[in-house]
């Protein structure tokens, strides 16, 4: 049986936070102020880990985040059924309690400030901006009523005080093969959907969702459909409305050709659906970045092993970067820590040269 690393980390963190409340003895103590000031863009796992590590070493940190609440995907991107005790905000407050970290909410890169400004005003910059864009399905009917982004669906659920008041489809089709697709599918079942199908264009072995997540979804009643890609979303006029609403999804069965490339078989079928949730990945939103100077690798920010970008004094980590690992919270946290230590070393070299 695989080791439940996430559950173990959750238990250890909860235990430590509770211990500090009882004992009054914090685990971490901040070093004396160094006079250095770092900007962190994004209050998700990568940004918070970077900020906390920098603050421990005595550097001041200002975090800018576009949302109302800090936490990133831990606050907005994990299904409500997995987060029953407001752990994301408790953990954020625990991290910020070390001191030396100032948080500015509702401050968005590209809208309220640009990377150029941060480079002028701070000694270093860390970008933990995640992936704010949504991949298009490129299928007819994508704009019909009832077709939603799974990420937005989950975020709405997480910020709702009463899940029973939220509308849910009777027949839901989730398109995608990652953990977001699993979350959206299972959450739909728990909200009362009669039939939930999760469709993926390849096989289970190619899904980024873990086998444990897939098994859990099946046990909850989700039907996992492999080797099926959406061709179009069928719309139908509803009584009292002039706008068409999703009523079914037409799929084509797929397979791998002799070269291992995905191809359609020409065989098609339809699944009824009054709600279609797209969970086919996210993209980098480059607004506010120095795109002409900041090197991108494909659709993400290119970084070295320490998280350094092509711009001097700018580091990045988490989902927005091109690291080869999976887009997991634990990887984002590690990215933030590694970048923070690289920034600390850079500051030390600067002091040594000045001396």
Please annotate each region the language model reported.
Residues 1-12, 62, 69, 100-101:
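Iron-sulfur cluster-binding cysteine motifs and their immediate structural context
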Residues 8, 12-32, 93-106, 111, ...:
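Glycine-rich dinucleotide-binding loop and its adjacent helix/turn
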Residues 32-41, 89-139, 232-250, 275, ...:
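Feature captures the FAD/FMN-dependent oxidoreductase FAD-binding
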Residues 37-62, 181-189:
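N-terminal Rossmann-like FAD-binding beta1-loop-alpha1 element of flavoenzymes
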Residues 44-45, 69, 178-180, 321:
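Residue-level detector of alpha-helix initiation sites
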Residues 63, 67-97, 103-104, 185-232, ...:
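Rossmann-like dinucleotide-binding cores of NAD(P)H-dependent redox enzymes
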Residues 143-169, 259-326, 330:
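FAD-site-proximal beta/loop scaffold in flavoenzymes
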Residues 184, 320-351:
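A conserved FAD-binding loop/helix module that cradles the flavin
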